[in-house]
């Protein structure tokens, strides 16, 4: 029991002395950004002011100048006179010429169809990509991956978003589209928070089993980015993280929660990697008026 407690403490709290994040990156390292961007909140051009949430998100992405970016809750429209395309900005303006967008829901019934899912953007060529479906008929999320050619070193990057718990976004008066949660609307509308936690924990456990199975099969050194919707003390995190390096544990300080609501200590977003790779610095700034998640920026040594 004592050992179990220590395990949770060291997974939850970073014990490294605070260090200033070095903007200059060494040549044998890649800079990675992982972020649940919350659909960019609003892509309507009439709301795209200099301090709009979407603009704050894109400005931070630009400032980081990462080599590889993994996004959860990513969405994009086709560019038109009313709506901005997030993909177009990342490719044409920021020059991320290689990307793989795993579309989980195309939202084809909307007046202007919006594609939603997870995405990987890279300055390095993508030589292979694919995805594995979680077994939920009405909520078709995936574990996606892209194999990158990083200076002749093949590295596989995985990215995923585990099932949202709907703890506060879906109340009875919400005007959201419920079509994608048909299999568990009873829990969403009528379940108390504790019931939701129990239900979605069981969902996450099944998703974690598929993730760990695929990570164990990886033929290459890999990086795993995710919004786990589970904290480090959970079975889900402990199962996935087993035998892997955690960028936060290697370089993080304090609690460093990644979710801005409910509790400042909730570290539900992670960057993990196989033992051939190591994080050399970690940064998760509190970006205001942006996503409800905080970004993770880390430098990873490629041997």
Specify the residue positions occupied by each region the protein language model found:
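Metal-dependent phosphoester-hydrolase catalytic domains
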Residues: 1-12, 131, 202-223, 228-303
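Extracytoplasmic/periplasmic, Sec-exported soluble proteins
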Residues: 49, 53, 66, 82, ...
């Amino acid at each position: 029991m004592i050992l179990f407690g220590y395990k949770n403490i060291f997974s939850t709290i970073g014990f490294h002395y605070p260090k200033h994040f070095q903007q200059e990156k060494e040549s044998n390292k890649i800079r990675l950004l992982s972020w649940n961007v919350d659909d960019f909140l609003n892509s309507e051009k009439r709301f795209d002011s200099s301090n709009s949430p979407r603009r704050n998100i894109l400005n931070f992405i630009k400032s980081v100048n990462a080599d590889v970016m993994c996004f959860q809750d990513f969405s994009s429209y086709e560019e038109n006179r009313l709506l901005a395309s997030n993909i177009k900005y990342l490719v044409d303006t920021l020059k991320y010429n290689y990307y793989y967008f795993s579309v989980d829901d195309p939202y084809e019934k909307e007046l202007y169809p919006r594609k939603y899912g997870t995405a990987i953007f890279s300055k390095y060529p993508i030589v292979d990509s694919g995805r594995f479906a979680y077994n939920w008929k009405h909520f078709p999320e995936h574990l996606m991956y892209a194999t990158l050619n990083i200076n002749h070193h093949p590295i596989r990057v995985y990215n995923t978003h585990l099932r949202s718990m709907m703890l506060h976004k879906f109340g009875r008066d919400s005007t959201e589209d419920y079509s994608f949660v048909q299999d568990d609307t009873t829990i969403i509308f009528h379940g108390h928070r504790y019931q939701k936690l129990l239900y979605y924990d069981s969902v996450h456990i099944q998703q974690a089993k598929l993730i760990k199975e695929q990570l164990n099969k990886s033929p290459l050194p890999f990086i795993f980015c995710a919004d786990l919707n589970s904290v480090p003390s959970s079975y889900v995190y402990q199962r996935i993280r087993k035998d892997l390096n955690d960028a936060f544990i290697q370089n993080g300080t304090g609690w460093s929660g990644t979710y801005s609501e409910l509790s400042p200590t909730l570290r539900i977003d992670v960057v993990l990697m196989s033992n051939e790779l190591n994080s050399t610095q970690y940064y998760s700034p509190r970006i205001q008026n942006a996503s409800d998640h905080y970004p993770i920026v880390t430098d990873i040594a490629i041997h």
